[in-house]
Regions:
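NAD(P)+-binding Rossmann beta1-loop-alpha1 motif at the extreme N-terminus of oxidoreductases
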Residues: 2-33
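Rossmann-fold NAD(P) dinucleotide-binding segment
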Residues: 69-80, 89-111
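C-terminal helical cap and adjacent loop that interface with cofactors, partners, or active-site loops
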Residues: 280-354
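Active-site-lining helix/loop region of Rossmann-like oxidoreductase modules
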Residues: 10, 14, 18, 22, ...
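Rossmann-fold NAD(P)-binding glycine/threonine-rich loop
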Residues: 111-136
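NAD(P)-binding Rossmann-fold cofactor-contacting core
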Residues: 30-54
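Short, ordered loop/turn segments at secondary-structure junctions
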Residues: 40-42, 86, 104, 110-114, ...
Length: 354
């Protein structure tokens, strides 16, 4: 939704986890006024600044039920809702819908909403129509915006021709509260029983890297004709210790997973993805968050980021996308619709188009 604000951008935030707390601290630095914070259960009624480890800001954490959301939106009239909670669209919709219906643009950290048309074809169309009907934009950003899509598309611009693109990403999951769903520390037998009792939900059934690569294919104007997915559960080859979680993991137990995807295009370019999500093994010198992009073509290119600083770059990517979301036309947008992300050094309101 195009904007011509006279004052600062006003935003509400959903989620007080790692990303949410970082945004509470960072939004004021970019001239964004925080007018509301929502959480499912934790910290309700507390000062959100204190929850984030900052000075008190006077913005209390509210419950995220529909009535509470609409009440805060009606009272504070924000320009943007930043949602840093879950990934899957069915769980996100109860948060997105009241925002959209109240005329509030939405920026989400969801890896599935980043390019949802292959996973939620009907839900994506419905969300697009709802956003257009209310004149607002819905968009998802985060680490994938830069490292999984934009860097790849930029590298292709330095080539005469391309045969394939191989993207390998290692993400350590220690600092994120969802790590237990991976079955960390379980034996193979225990993990198989765990899966029977806890079927993989939609939020963890799809590789974020594969979804982002589909977005890259679209951004490059290519046509995907086939996709092949694989999953390997990773087990420790020796006793290991994770310092951040103070967690001992015995040899032969689950430490993470490796999701692989191959996407073939009608234009003859093949995309290969390997997304490794695991607990860091510090004794092996593994800090995690490695990102590598290999382009086979003319010329061959190999770009390695040894540590992409996942927590920080997720938040920074979202902050820098705020003006892009507010400047975009109504509807559900993906990275294929917007310009490349870049650092916004001035107050974010200065980047809004009239």
């Amino acid at each position: 939704m195009k904007n011509s604000l006279k004052g600062p951008i006003r935003a509400v935030l959903f989620g007080v986890g790692v990303t949410g707390r970082e945004l509470i601290a960072r939004l004021p630095e970019r001239g964004v006024e925080l007018t509301g914070v929502f959480a499912r259960s934790s910290h309700i009624g507390e000062d959100s600044g204190l929850v984030a480890g900052c000075a008190a800001n006077g913005v209390k954490v509210s419950p995220s039920d529909d009535a509470s959301i609409r009440a805060v939106l009606s009272e504070t009239k924000p320009d943007l809702a930043i949602i840093c909670t879950t990934d899957d669209l069915p769980t996100l919709m109860p948060l997105i819908k009241p925002c959209v219906e109240c005329g509030v643009n939405v920026l989400s950290s969801s890896g599935l909403l980043y390019y949802p048309y292959g996973i939620y074809p009907e839900g994506s169309v419905e969300l697009d129509e709802l956003a257009k009907a209310n004149g607002v934009t819905v968009f998802a950003s985060g680490i994938q915006d830069v490292f999984f899509t934009s860097l790849v598309t930029v590298l292709t611009g330095a080539c005469y021709s391309i045969k394939s693109v191989t993207l390998t990403d290692l993400a350590t999951i220690d600092r994120f509260d969802f790590w237990p769903v991976f079955g960390i520390g379980k034996t193979k037998e225990e993990y198989e029983e765990y899966l029977k009792a806890h079927p993989v939900d939609e939020a963890h059934a799809y590789s974020h890297l594969a979804i982002a690569t589909n977005a890259t294919v679209a951004a490059l104007g290519l046509t995907a004709v086939a996709q092949h997915d694989g999953l390997e559960i990773l087990y420790t080859d020796e006793d290991t210790y994770n310092a951040y979680r103070d967690l001992h993991i015995k040899k032969g137990c689950v430490i993470g997973k490796n999701e692989t995807t191959v996407i073939e295009t009608a234009e003859g370019i093949t995309f290969r993805c390997e997304f490794i999500s695991k607990m860091a093994e510090e004794h092996k010198g593994e800090t995690g968050n490695l990102n590598r992009i290999v382009v086979e073509g003319e010329p061959n290119l190999d770009l390695v980021t040894t540590d992409k600083h996942g927590e920080m770059t997720t938040t920074a990517s979202m902050l820098n996308r705020i003006p892009d979301v507010l400047n975009a036309g109504p509807g559900l947008k993906t990275v294929a619709d917007l310009s490349m992300p870049y650092l916004k050094v001035k107050p974010l309101v200065d980047y809004l188009e009239a």
